[in-house]
Amino acid sequence: MIKKFFIFFVSVNLFAESIVVDGNLDEPEWQTAFKITEFYESDPYTLRKTDDETEAYIFSNEDGIYVGFINYQDESTMLSNRTMRDEMSSLSEKNSINIDFDGDRTKAYIIAVALGDSLFD
């Protein structure tokens, strides 16, 4: 059975009035957000298209940068292994974003969340 999972991922500023960090992407701002639907496997580094549909939304305003994910995946295939905080294991399903504010590819902010409620930043 395919289930639809919503993960609200990150907000640089959690005190914005327009976006509520509640796991739902139902605010009107998400309708105008930049949408990404093409994803590739990076661990292992095969760069093949992923089998499961994922939608990522990026929205920014003067209050911050907001990223939301909607993951569609058969529940029986989910890996929700618990990992230690800040452990970037390939043994679990996760969504992550990298932000290189300088655009020079020498440093970036990496933020991730996994099915087992593990966090990485």
Predicted features, each with a name:
Residues I2-L14:
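Sec-dependent N-terminal signal peptides
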